[in-house]
C-alpha cells in the first residue's frame, strides 16, 4: 500500500481542483482511533479521495476506550499520543502520525506499546517523549473534548470512523478493501449525497470480509 503524507495530500488537493471536479477544496473532518482497523481502512480511502477530488481531510481523535468505559492501556496509548502530536505539532501533523502508527498496528501487527509509538514518532521526526507522556493522564481532558466533539452528532451507539461533512456527521463508511482511483471518488460522491439529507440515519449489511490491507 502506498502511504500518503500531508505534503502529498496538499499537492493532491491542488491537482484535483484542476480536474473534472474543479472547485473549492472541501474540508472533511475525520474522527479515528488508531487501534481500529475499520477506521484505518476508511482513512486510507479518504487519502485516496484527496487524489481525485477537491477534498482535504482533517484528522481528529476519538477513543474506543472512552466510548466503552475501558482503561486498557492498549486502547489509550495511541489516542493519547495522537492528542500529544496535535498539541505539539498542530492538526495537520496528526495524519502523518496516524499513518506511521496505523501502519505499525495494522500492517505490521506490532504491539500497542511505548516502543511502537516511539518508532512512529521517530519516523515522523517528532519528539519521542510524547510516547512516555501517553502513558499518563496528561492529555486526557483534551482527549475527552476531541472525542465528544466527534461523537456527539452521531450518538454513542456507533464507533469509528466518524466523518463530519457539510454541517452533518455520519458513522462510516465501513469498507474493505479501500477503493482506489475514480472508484474512491465515486464512493465519496455518494457518501456526500447521503449526508446532505438530514433525515438519513442508517444503511447497513452484514460484513462478509475482514479488513483487507492492500
What is each of the regions a protein language model found here?
Residues 1-14:
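N-terminal acidic, proline/glycine-rich, low-complexity intrinsically disordered segments
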Residues 24, 32, 159:
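Short metal-coordination and nucleic-acid-contact micro-motifs, chiefly zinc-binding Cys/His arrays
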Residues 29, 33-35, 162-164:
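Conserved acidic functional residues
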Amino acid at each position: 500500500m502506498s502511504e500518503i503524507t500531508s505534503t502529498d495530500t496538499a499537492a493532491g488537493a491542488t491537482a484535483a481542483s484542476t480536474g473534472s471536479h474543479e472547485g473549492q477544496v472541501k474540508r472533511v473532518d475525520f474522527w479515528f482511533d488508531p487501534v481500529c482497523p475499520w477506521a484505518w481502512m476508511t482513512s486510507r480511502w479518504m487519502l485516496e479521495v484527496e487524489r481525485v477530488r477537491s477534498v482535504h481531510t482533517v484528522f481528529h481523535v476519538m477513543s474506543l476506550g472512552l466510548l466503552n468505559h475501558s482503561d486498557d492501556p492498549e486502547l489509550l496509548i495511541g489516542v493519547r499520543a495522537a492528542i500529544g502530536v496535535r498539541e505539539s505539532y498542530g492538526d495537520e501533523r496528526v495524519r502523518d502520525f496516524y499513518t506511521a502508527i496505523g501502519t505499525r498496528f495494522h500492517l505490521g501487527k506490532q504491539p500497542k506499546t511505548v516502543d511502537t509509538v516511539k518508532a512512529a514518532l521517530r519516523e515522523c521526526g517528532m519528539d519521542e517523549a510524547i510516547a512516555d507522556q501517553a502513558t499518563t493522564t496528561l492529555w486526557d481532558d483534551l482527549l475527552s473534548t476531541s472525542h465528544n466533539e466527534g461523537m456527539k452528532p452521531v450518538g454513542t451507539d456507533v464507533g469509528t470512523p466518524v466523518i463530519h461533512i457539510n454541517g452533518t456527521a455520519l458513522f462510516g463508511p465501513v469498507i474493505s478493501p479501500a477503493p482506489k482511483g475514480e472508484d474512491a471518488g465515486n464512493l465519496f460522491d455518494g457518501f456526500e449525497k447521503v449526508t446532505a439529507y438530514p433525515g438519513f440515519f442508517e444503511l447497513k449489511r452484514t460484513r462478509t470480509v475482514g479488513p483487507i490491507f492492500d
